[in-house]
Amino acid sequence: MQNQSKKCLFEVCANGVESCMAAQEGGADRVELCAGIPEGGTTPSYGEIKIARRMLNTTRLHVIIRPRGGDFLYTPLEVERMEEDIRMCRQLGVDGVVIRKVEFASLI
């Protein structure tokens, strides 16, 4: 078995296309694109994602999927919105999505 060293990835949180481009120019391996950073990060707009995907050619693009700030307890309607956002990201060729969800039962 060969000794394979694992490379550390350089990931940058970006709040828009401009930040994505700066991260790519700075050598980032991956960008996590999000809006609403003061709220803890929310899903960016369709246009922001589409343009970021087009502009990033050497850096992987991951998009946060979060319909709002606050807790991570989502209503069924919010989950449906998140599922649609994931489908949109897939159609746009995003490399991955970032999700956090807390189940109510896990709080007990």
Protein language model annotation of sequence segments:
Residues 2-5, 28-36:
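Short, charged, low-hydrophobicity "junction" segments
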Residues 8-14, 31-33, 61-65, 97-99:
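Hydrophobic faces of well-ordered beta-strands that scaffold small-molecule active sites
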Residues 17-21, 25, 37-60, 76-80, ...:
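Active-site-adjacent beta->alpha loops and helix N-cap segments on the catalytic face
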Residues 89:
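Residue-level signal for inorganic ion chemistry
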